[in-house]
Amino acid sequence: MVQKHKNLKTLRFAKIISYIFDGSVLVLPVFLAICFYGKQNLAAIVPAFLTAIIFTALIPYMAILLLYKARKVSDLQIPKRKERLFPLLIINTCIVAGFFVLIYMQPEKLLLSVYMIYLLGLPAISLITLFWKISFHASYVTLFSIVYLIVFGKWGILTIPLILLVGWSRIKLKRHTLAQVLGGIAVIGTISLTVFYITGYLTTDYRAISELSWLLRSSSDYMNLVLPGFGLTLVFILAYIFLQIY
């Protein structure tokens, strides 16, 4: 009885995590960070910020809500792969339309770069989900973490554990397998890093990357001492998680 109650609490916590880190929710902190952190002329940024939010979150979420009320989808997070096609068509159309609006507005380079990741990443994940249930949650939280690393430098490292937390929640709720979570991380991670590399944000000339590079170099001696033990511990932890899941 106690074990059952504990399991219910764990499932409830996993569900809360899934809702908090839903893609439509994470859009707001992503664009808030890139649009307003360290900026001077905030009023000039607001139109582009609102445009990005409207086309990546507001319209797609309202469309899914209407589909849910019309009973075209059984859950707001659309866990059933067969129900995803029409909502994804709407969302991808919104993303493409928003891109052309943003091009006309000529936003800052970082905002356009992040929007490009949505423009390339969402269709890629949408195509994959037609035959394999890749994790959208894992994709979105990975993008969130990478953006925060680009914007906030070393402080962005604090967001990396969120990827593990969200991945755990999706597996715990049995919405995805470990492979599907890792797939979401890999796809959006690759696209994000490629876009940021092409647009010049992955060089040490950029403040955040320079800061991260310095942090890694300054801690290298310490890591040389602790990494073998840490690596062995990590292997045992991953083995334990694998055995628990499978």
Where are the model-predicted features located?
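Short, hydrophobic transmembrane alpha-helix segments
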Residues: 34-47
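The first (N-terminal) embedded transmembrane alpha-helix
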Residues: 17-37
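Membrane-embedded catalytic cores of phosphoryl/pyrophosphoryl-handling enzymes
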Residues: 108-245
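Short, Lys/Arg-rich, polar N-terminal cytosolic tail immediately upstream
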Residues: 1-14
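Transmembrane helix-loop-helix
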Residues: 81-86, 98-114, 224
